[in-house]
Amino acid sequence: MIEADRIISAIAKSDDEAVDRAIRPKLLQDYVGQPQVRSQMEIFIQAAKLRQDALDHLLIFGPPGLGKTTLANIVANEMGVNIRTTSGPVLEKAGDLAAMLTNLEPHDVLFIDEIHRLSPAIEEVLYPAMEDYQLDIMIGEGPAARSIKLDLPPFTLIGATTRAGSLTSPLRDRFGIVQRLEFYSIEDLTSIVMRSAACLNLEISDDASHEVARRSRGTPRIANRLLRRVRDYADVKNNGMITQGIAKAALAMLDIDQAGFDYLDRKLLSSIIERFDGGPVGLDNLAAAIGEERDTIEDVLEPYLIQQGFLQRTPRGRIATSQTYRHFGLAKLADK
């Protein structure tokens, strides 16, 4: 199974974008969850505006689907500036980055998603731009080549990544603000589902919102996607009204259990129990057993399973916890 094809994948899909733009909060006061990040950013933004400075460069990291792009857009809105958006894989040439930097207005935001995938050549251009607001450009070729410096207006670089550890130290050290986004609580996700339903003019009960939230793996992107699929079911089965019963039936149809697991999650956990006697099992063996890339397991599947206490990542390998045995109705084996 391709990770992006899963209904509970936290990776953005093309059909998510239009709806996400419609329901995405624009200001910090509408931003639900991440209380520490929100309170810190309120102070940092207000201070920058009082000093009439650009906000310090900001690195946002955490699992996919938690709102890194949303937060970047909120920062630009709160600062009252424009935002230019790109991603690490798109910036193939130094000239691509130079063109974006030279078109920025004072205090504008340049948002680079997947910043850990920048090439070394692009990073070399970024260093003086971030530190001194200067751009070094090579003119000519061969022996006649020379470097010229261009002054840039003060700007804010916001980098987003799911793999902060993959950033080089020189790049990471140039971010004055670093924020980690955590998985959301069920209470916060319930609020997000209710807010999204209101934006989409949907009728949904409080307990139905809670039902969607608790199966959303702590991730707003998944919650909003599940809400749209539950809406489809409600339109056909209940004249559009989303009750708890309708939500449960829709999610059962989608094969999403009460822990928010789909077939792939259950396959990973059951493989550890059945094929490897509960673990420990190495990542390569586990990837081969379930037919997925090791990066998919490490970056997409594991964070939620570990955070929820279903999986342990140890130096000797992955181990299924007693909670996993109970989830599969194998509580007796938890004491082996």
From Swiss-Prot:
CDD domains in the record: AAA (cd00009)
Chain residues that bind DNA: 294, 313, 318
Record GO biological process: DNA recombination; DNA repair
Residues noted as binding Mg(2+) in the record, renumbered to the chain: 69
Keywords of the record: ATP-binding, Cytoplasm, DNA damage, DNA recombination, DNA repair, DNA-binding, Hydrolase, Nucleotide-binding
Residues bound to ATP: 23-24, 65, 68-70, 131-133, 174, 184, 221
Region annotated Small ATPAse domain (RuvB-S), chain positions: 185-255
Chain segments carrying region Large ATPase domain (RuvB-L): 4-184
UniProt KW Nucleotide-binding keyword: yes
Stretch list, region Head domain (RuvB-H): 258-336
PANTHER family in the record: HOLLIDAY JUNCTION BRANCH MIGRATION COMPLEX SUBUNIT RUVB, PTHR42848
Free-text comment on this protein's domains from its UniProt entry: Has 3 domains, the large (RuvB-L) and small ATPase (RuvB-S) domains and the C-terminal head (RuvB-H) domain. The head domain binds DNA, while the ATPase domains jointly bind ATP, ADP or are empty depending on the state of the subunit in the translocation cycle. During a single DNA translocation step the structure of each domain remains the same, but their relative positions change.
The protein, known as: Holliday junction branch migration complex subunit RuvB
Species for this entry: Actinobacillus succinogenes (strain ATCC 55618 / DSM 22257 / CCUG 43843 / 130Z)
Originating gene: ruvB
